[in-house]
Amino acid sequence: MSEKKKVLVAMSGGVDSSAAAALLVQQGYQCDGAMLKLAPNEDSRCCSADDAEDARQAATRLGMRFYVFNETARFRRCVMDKFVAEYGAGRTPNPCIDCNRELKFGALLDRALTLGYDYIATGHYARVDLDETTGKYRLLRGAERRKDQSYVLYQLTQRQLAHLLLPVGDYDKPAIRDKARQAGLDNADKGDSQDICFVPDGDYVGFLRREGLPLTPGDFVDRDGRVLGRHKGLPCYTAGQRKGLGVAAGKHVYVLSKNGVDNTILLGDDAELYASSLLASHVNWISGETPAQPVRCAAKTRYSQTEAPCTAYPLPDGGLRVVFDQPQRAITPGQAVVLYDGDVVLGGGTIEKSE
C-alpha cells in the first residue's frame, strides 16, 4: 500500500489476536497493540497480568507499541451489572455480545479513531467485505464453520465495519497457530479461553450470589398451575434442563420457562420445549436499513447451534418476529437470535419470548 494505514489491534494475550497482528504487519499495515483492562480482579481469565504480559511480548516481537486501557468501570456497568440483572429477571444473557458492543467495538474503536488510527482489528473468526453493488459493508461467517464467531458480532454497524479488520477469519485454527509460530510468537500453542471471562470457574450461581443477587426459592409448576416441587432460585436453572431438578414427577420433566414476576419455573415434557416462532427486541440490521418486507433466511438462537430456515418479520415497533419452518428446541429469553443469508449475517436481536 502506498501509504501505510494505521491499525490498533485488540490483543488479549491469546494466539488469535496475536496472529491477527502478525498477519496485518505482514500485509504492510502500521500496527500497534492494545489490551482493554475489563475485569476488576486478577481471578478473571480475561486481561490478567499474565495475559497482558503475553500480549506485550507478542507486540514487542512484531515491533509494535503496546497500550493498556482501563475500562473496568464501563465493563462493570454495561456487562457485569446487566448480567446479574438479567439473571435476576429470569433470563439467560450473553455477556460476550454486550462486551463486543460496548467495549471492543465501542470504547476501543472510539479511542482508536481519537488517536488517529484508521482501523481496529480483533482475532474473531469472521470476515468483513464491501458489497460493491450496494456500497454497504457486510459481516460474513469465518471460513471455518466450527470456529465461526459471527453470532456474537451481529450488533456491528456500518460505521464500525468501515473501521474493522478481521484477518484471522480466512483461516482455520491450525493455520492460525502455524502463522503465529512462523512469526516467532511464544503464545502460538496457548490454549483457548473457555467460559465467561469474569466467571472463570464456570460457577455462575456462585458468582451471582457473591454479587448479592438473592436466590429466592419458589415453586416448580406445570401448565395447569399445579405445584410439582420447590426450586432453589431462578438463576440455578436454564431452559431445557432436566437433571438436578429434584422433582418426582413419575416421568422426565424439563425446564420450559422461568417467570421472574411470580418466581416460578414451568416444567413439562420434552415436546413442550419446541416452539415455532419467537419475538426479539433491540434489533440490529447490519445494512443499517430495516427490510420493508419479510425476509427468507436462516436463524440460530444459540452460539453453538446450526441455523434453521425461517422467515423474519420486521415489526412496526422496531422488534422482530422469526417464524421457523420447523419448531426449535429450548428458545431462551435473553439469548440472541441471529439471521443469516448464506454466509452473510443480516442482523439479529435479543430473544424476548418463544411462541
Which residues make up each language-model segment?
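ATP-dependent adenylation/nucleotidyltransferase module used to activate substrates
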Residues: M1-Y154, L165, P174, V255
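AMP-forming adenylation/ATP pyrophosphatase catalytic core
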Residues: P40, A121-E355
